[in-house]
Amino acid sequence: MASSIVSSAAVATRSNVAQASMVAPFTGLKSAASFPVTKKNNNVDITSLASNGGRVRCMQVWPPINMKKYETLSYLPDLSDEQLLKEVEYLLKNGWVPCLEFETEHGFVYREHNSSPGYYDGRYWTMWKLPMFGCTDGTQVLAEVQEAKNAYPQAWIRIIGFDNVRQVQCISFIAYKPEGY
């Protein structure tokens, strides 16, 4: 057993010496030699040197003007009634308790009373009625959303899925935004 350990260590040191002097070829970019060149340009632009031969696709950042961020997926378009129903059914299928909240002034996080990092005002909204313990039908939740819309047409309304076993909020999404937002 000891001889096998010694021999494997000896083999490993030999391969490490050989690997230390070798340089692996770079395979990330396509070789410029494979593309036909018709004219040699002496004024080479530095940005054209590193190219993978394809189109550059950049992700657009969140526009900060007139686009408030409400929840995690707030960059998506507003959910239709069918999509809301599917989200609520997903919430119910996981055994979470649906709960509605609304906010009449600020439907987004903001800083007003404190400038500490990580502290935001507007995180806590007013609960609409009581949590819907025992709810098994997504249309009941959407009926409550409609009732909240009728009572507060200028308010933001969100649906929360609460796990009463772990005592945590598992899902939260905007169900209604006032006109102009």
Swiss-Prot record:
Note from the entry: The basic functional RuBisCO is composed of a large chain homodimer in a 'head-to-tail' conformation. In form I RuBisCO this homodimer is arranged in a barrel-like tetramer with the small subunits forming a tetrameric 'cap' on each end of the 'barrel'.
Transit peptide location: 1-57
Keywords, sorted A to Z: Calvin cycle, Carbon dioxide fixation, Chloroplast, Photorespiration, Photosynthesis, Plastid, Transit peptide
Record text on subunit structure and interactions: Heterohexadecamer of 8 large and 8 small subunits.
SUPFAM superfamilies in the record: RuBisCO, small subunit
Family statement drawn from the similarity comment of this UniProt entry: Belongs to the RuBisCO small chain family.
GO molecular function, one term: ribulose-bisphosphate carboxylase activity
Pfam families: RbcS, RuBisCO_small
Name of the featured protein: Ribulose bisphosphate carboxylase small subunit, chloroplastic 1
Native source species: Solanum tuberosum
Keyword Chloroplast: yes
Its biological purpose: RuBisCO catalyzes two reactions: the carboxylation of D-ribulose 1,5-bisphosphate, the primary event in carbon dioxide fixation, as well as the oxidative fragmentation of the pentose substrate. Both reactions occur simultaneously and in competition at the same active site. Although the small subunit is not catalytic it is essential for maximal activity.
Cross-referenced InterPro entries: RuBisCO_ssu, RuBisCO_ssu_dom, RuBisCO_ssu_N, RuBisCO_ssu_sf
Subcellular location: Plastid, Chloroplast
PANTHER family: RIBULOSE BISPHOSPHATE CARBOXYLASE SMALL CHAIN 1, CHLOROPLASTIC, RIBULOSE BISPHOSPHATE CARBOXYLASE SMALL SUBUNIT, CHLOROPLASTIC 1
